[in-house]
């Protein structure tokens, strides 16, 4: 007969947390579901996900504005924590985010989906996220948000976007890997939770880590860099007068730098980070053998 302590341990595991093997099975099942459902539904599910991540970057930008003299690390920590709201909204609302969808590699390696189904889902979700992010770009632009704090909010957008396009290609690739390692760790850990509170709280610090550290998220950049491009090239003279900066300083914010210098390497890094470093690694180690 088992002792009380052993029974209590088993009960605790059963009640409060899914086992690593169970999490691997959930990860596989989620990948199968995403890749085999009607992809028009995936596309429309991806649009709000892109919008949620964009709104999270709006929140982040607000926390980084007007912080002259504040601790750099603490300011970034606050920004990272508030940004986690975006990923929480994605999970709670059942939306599809490209970065977490890279973990469908698990379902592919298990043989339950084809390469075509996996890649089709990635492409559909990627462009759905892009539509959602750009929708928020235009809403924020027409709302005049760049003039908030006497133009300092828009200046934060400009400096953040410009910083992102000046990584080397390999730096952007590596930052993309690091980012999606943390995003997918956050998503994977939600498979262990059994309540909404479990799932929401477990994601906060991994997401805060990637944001505060400056790692690169392809979907977030679908908002931030286009927002910077529009601000740099279409702002009224009053904006530049308010921030007292020559607009030529941000002339390099353009489509070429966005796509070639950032979006492509970051996207590839996100695929490696989520699909290989987390999805395949954790599934291979923990799945029932």
Model regions and ranges:
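Alpha-helical transmembrane segments and their helix-helix packing motifs
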Residues: 2-289
């Amino acid at each position: 007969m088992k002792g009380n302590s052993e029974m209590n341990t088993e009960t605790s595991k059963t009640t409060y947390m899914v086992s690593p093997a169970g999490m691997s099975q959930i990860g596989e099942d989620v990948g199968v579901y995403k890749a085999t459902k009607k992809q028009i539904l995936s596309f429309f599910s991806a649009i709000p996900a892109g919008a949620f991540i964009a709104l999270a970057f709006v929140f982040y930008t607000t926390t980084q504005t007007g912080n002259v003299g504040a601790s750099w690390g603490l300011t970034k920590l606050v920004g990272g924590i508030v940004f986690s709201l975006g990923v929480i909204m994605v999970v709670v609302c059942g939306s599809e985010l490209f970065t977490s969808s890279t973990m469908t590699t698990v379902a592919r390696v298990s043989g339950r989906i084809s390469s075509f189904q996996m890649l089709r889902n990635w492409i559909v979700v990627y462009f759905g996220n892009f539509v959602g992010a750009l929708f928020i770009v235009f809403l924020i632009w027409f709302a005049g948000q760049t003039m908030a704090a006497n133009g300092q909010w828009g200046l934060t957008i400009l400096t953040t976007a410009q910083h992102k396009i000046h990584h080397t290609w390999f730096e952007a690739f590596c930052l993309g890997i690091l980012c999606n390692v943390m995003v997918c760790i956050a998503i994977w850990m939600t498979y262990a939770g059994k309540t909404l509170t479990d799932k929401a709280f477990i994601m906060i610090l991994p997401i805060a880590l990637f944001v505060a550290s400056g790692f690169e998220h392809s979907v977030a950049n679908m908002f931030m860099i286009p927002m910077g491009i529009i601000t740099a090239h279409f702002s009224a003279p009053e904006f530049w007068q308010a921030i007292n900066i020559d607009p030529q300083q941000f002339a390099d914010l353009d489509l070429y730098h966005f796509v070639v210098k950032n979006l492509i390497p970051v996207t590839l890094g996100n695929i490696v980070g989520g699909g290989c470093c987390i999805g395949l690694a954790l599934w291979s180690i923990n799945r029932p053998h």
